[in-house]
């Protein structure tokens, strides 16, 4: 079992390993090019989510049809995508931006899944990164050779 499962997911393996594999000669140029194109599309969709504001008239019909509270003023898309019942696809349709995002390939299922997961689990992922950084600091801590372990009562 992996200690940091939220970071070591199957759906982000290519993001974690393709660059390393390419530098070791294990990933072909074609595969690396496809990966870079995917990352460009992911970046475009990520920027769309971060820069888009959703107006009440765009999202409220959907929220009300689900029995959820409507919004009263424009809200950043990042806040809406955080709701468990709202998918990125629903958000794009509500914002009426599908055609523009389709044109750049940002609505491919794999791209959508990657970015939706990134935003829905952002808080958990950030906490996990913080834990990893804390563990790295602890690993660098040097225990003095003169320490008397038998005098430590909690061991």
Language-model segment annotations:
Residues 1-3, 7-155:
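Extended, charge-enriched "interface" segments that sit outside catalytic cores
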């Amino acid at each position: 079992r992996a200690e940091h499962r939220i970071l070591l997911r199957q759906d982000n393996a290519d993001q974690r390993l393709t660059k390393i594999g390419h530098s070791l000669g294990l990933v072909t140029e074609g595969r690396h090019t496809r990966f870079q194109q995917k990352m460009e599309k992911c970046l475009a969709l990520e920027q769309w989510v971060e820069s888009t504001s959703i107006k009440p008239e765009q999202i409220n019909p959907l929220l009300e049809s689900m029995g959820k509270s409507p919004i009263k003023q424009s809200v950043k898309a990042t806040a809406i995508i955080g709701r468990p019942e709202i998918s990125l696809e629903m958000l794009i349709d509500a914002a009426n931006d599908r055609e523009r995002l389709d044109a750049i390939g940002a609505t491919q299922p794999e791209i959508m899944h990657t970015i939706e997961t990134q935003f829905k689990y952002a808080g958990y992922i950030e906490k996990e990164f913080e834990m990893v950084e804390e563990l790295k600091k602890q690993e660098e801590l040097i225990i003095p050779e003169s320490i008397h372990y038998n005098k430590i009562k909690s061991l």
